[in-house]
Amino acid sequence: NETIKGWYKDYIKTLLNHTNYYTGEKLMDSEAVFSWELSNEPRCTVDEFCKDDILYNWAKEMSAYVKSIDPYHMVSVGDEGFYNLGYQEAARQDLPSSAYSGYYGVDFDKLMTIDTVDFGTPHMYVDQWGFDLGDDDLEWIKRHAQTTSSADKPIIFEEFGLTDKTKRDAAYSDWLDIVTGDYY
């Protein structure tokens, strides 16, 4: 919807041009800003209103718009990192369908091909997404690292969580071992 996209662009322009009361500096000129994120967990559940490329096209257009105003800061989509392999392929690979089938209208592989998106921002909520600990969770981290590496882009695992506190320490240790590798 062009009207909604216009409103979003007005919001972006206002935000990036906002002057900090204390420093007198526009946000787009601030060294305190690490990057801009287009949205937190954007989704476009696949139905008659949300076709395959809706979110991709939106991210491509809006990230380019942000860069047209502020070419100096990085931009991310803010998506959860869902894939669009299709239901049959997700089942064939024995992957949790909600995160890999394309149901949410997100295609992490494709989003990482956008030139004006500078890094990936996957999230991971193991029990909410039906992941098996020690299997699906580790595959999720590795697959996202491969995707961003292939796109020659960095990755920040922005959010992750596990409801079961008795398993949390061990799981977090496994996840961080993959992320940090031999660095520590």
Tell me the role of every PLM-derived stretch:
Residues 6, 10-24, 35, 39-184:
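Extracellular glycoside hydrolase catalytic/binding regions
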Residues 32:
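Catalytic core of nucleotidyl cyclases, primarily class III adenylyl/guanylyl cyclases
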Residues 29:
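Charged, cofactor-coupling segments
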Residues 1-3:
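Aromatic- and acidic-residue-enriched carbohydrate-binding clefts of CAZyme catalytic domains
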